[in-house]
């Protein structure tokens, strides 16, 4: 019984001292002008454009006009 009490006290002490050490070690957050915001990310996505991959078109119906892989069928994507 004595060993259990000593172990619980020791673990509690280590836990509490560890929590205070991590709180002291945190680096304060400083916002800089170089941080990317949602506007910059949206502009980059608009410049890049979509993919010609048949797997990148989303969850639409599989039988859309121009989405067939049959030779000679019209292709929907004309990107280089």
Curated annotation (Swiss-Prot):
Membrane-spanning parts: none
Natural source organism: Arabidopsis thaliana (Mouse-ear cress)
GO terms for MF: LRR domain binding; receptor serine/threonine kinase binding
Function, in words: Brassicaceae-specific phytocytokine (plant endogenous peptide released into the apoplast) perceived by MIK2 in a BAK1/SERK3 and SERK4 coreceptors-dependent manner, that modulates various physiological and antimicrobial processes including growth prevention and reactive oxygen species (ROS) response regulation.
The keyword Secreted appears for this protein: yes
Gene (name only): PROSCOOP18
Listed name of the protein: Serine rich endogenous peptide 18
Region ranges (Disordered): 50-80
Segments carrying motif SCOOP motif: 45-59
UniProt motif (SxS motif essential for MIK2 binding) ranges: 51-53
Cleaved signal peptide residues: 1-25
Record's keyword terms, sorted: Apoplast, Cell membrane, Cleavage on pair of basic residues, Membrane, Secreted, Signal
Cellular-component GO terms for this entry: apoplast; plasma membrane
Family affiliation: Belongs to the serine rich endogenous peptide (SCOOP) phytocytokine family.
């Amino acid at each position: 019984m004595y060993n259990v009490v000593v172990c619980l006290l020791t673990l509690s002490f280590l836990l509490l001292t560890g929590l205070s050490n991590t709180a002291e070690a945190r680096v304060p957050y400083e916002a800089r002008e170089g941080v990317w915001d949602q506007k910059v990310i949206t502009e980059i996505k608009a410049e890049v454009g979509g993919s010609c991959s048949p797997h990148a078109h989303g969850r639409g119906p599989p039988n859309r006009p121009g989405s067939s892989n049959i030779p000679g069928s019209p292709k929907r994507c004309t990107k280089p």
